[in-house]
Swiss-Prot record:
Assembly notes: Homodimer. Heterodimer with FRA2.
List of residues binding glutathione: K163, R200, F212, L225, D226
Miscellaneous section: Present with 7800 molecules/cell in log phase SD medium.
Entry-linked PANTHER family: GLUTAREDOXIN FAMILY MEMBER, GLUTAREDOXIN-3
Single annotated GO MF: disulfide oxidoreductase activity
Family statement drawn from the similarity comment of this UniProt entry: Belongs to the glutaredoxin family. Monothiol subfamily.
Residue stretches making up the Thioredoxin domain: 3-110
Identification of the protein by name: Monothiol glutaredoxin-4
């Protein structure tokens, strides 16, 4: 089974409606500017070759080239996965974590557990519905978690560490900062710190900042909600200047 690259909205509509009954449709939203998508594109290709079931369909969508499709699912960050079954969204993941993607695919498609061995790669962003940290994460040393944080804060030019996801924030401060980024039309990656206690606690020390959300630009800590608001008040072009 191969991944179908979406070229038009008509093609997307056809593939998500024609002979789609009882099929698990996996939508993969990506962008050329997002480095984590490179890893997940490779993972998706590898996994799709191992899934021989006729009831799974993989569609790859460039979020920038097809905004009309991205808007339908309120895509605010990439990589982003949407699992659809019988016309209903059954799960959404914003992640560059192969283990989380494969685990979700296994559960929803009843795929063989051996699929888990076909995807390996670095972790970066979050699974909106993850239940918690893995055993590997619990055993991380301080050096290992710091190395992971360095990768995470640089996973996208603008990285937001928040409670919840852009589509479902878990606190008012996170919701406000997402709104500010969208208002200024800033592309951003995000990490749901509620899903990973190691990241949640270690990032406070890493950033020397005790609360969330936290915003990073080009790998540099910018501040929390109040600091970002103040920065914009002082410089309306704050984001443009920070991204230079």
């Amino acid at each position: 089974m191969t991944v179908v690259e979406i070229k038009s909205q008509d093609q997307f509509t056809q593939l998500t409606t024609t002979n789609a009954a009882n099929k698990l449709i996996v939508l993969y939203f990506k962008a050329q500017w997002a480095d984590p998508c490179k890893t997940m594109s490779q993972v998706l290709e590898a996994v799709s070759e191992k899934v021989r079931q006729e009831d799974v369909r993989f569609l790859s969508i460039d979020a920038d080239e097809h905004p009309e499709i991205s808007d339908l699912f309120e895509i605010a960050a990439v990589p982003y996965f949407v699992f659809i079954q019988n016309g209903t969204i059954v799960k959404e993941i914003s992640a560059a974590d192969p283990k989380e993607f494969v685990k979700s695919l296994e559960i929803l498609s009843n795929a063989s557990a051996s699929l888990a061995n076909n995807a390996k790669g670095p972790k970066s962003t979050s699974d909106e519905e993850s239940s918690g940290s893995s055993d590997d994460e619990e055993d991380e040393t301080e050096e290992e978690i710091n190395a992971r944080l360095v990768k995470l804060v640089q996973a996208a030019p603008v990285m937001l560490f928040m409670k919840g996801s852009p589509s479902e924030p878990k606190c008012g401060f996170s919701r406000q900062l997402v709104g500010i980024l969208r208002e200024h039309q800033i592309r951003f990656g995000f990490f749901d710190i509620l899903r990973d206690e190691n990241v949640r606690q270690s990032l406070k020390k890493f950033s020397d900042w005790p609360t969330f959300p936290q915003l990073y630009i080009n790998g540099e800590f910018q501040g929390g909600l109040d600091i970002i608001k103040e920065s914009i008040e002082e410089d309306p072009e704050y984001f443009q200047h920070a991204l230079q």
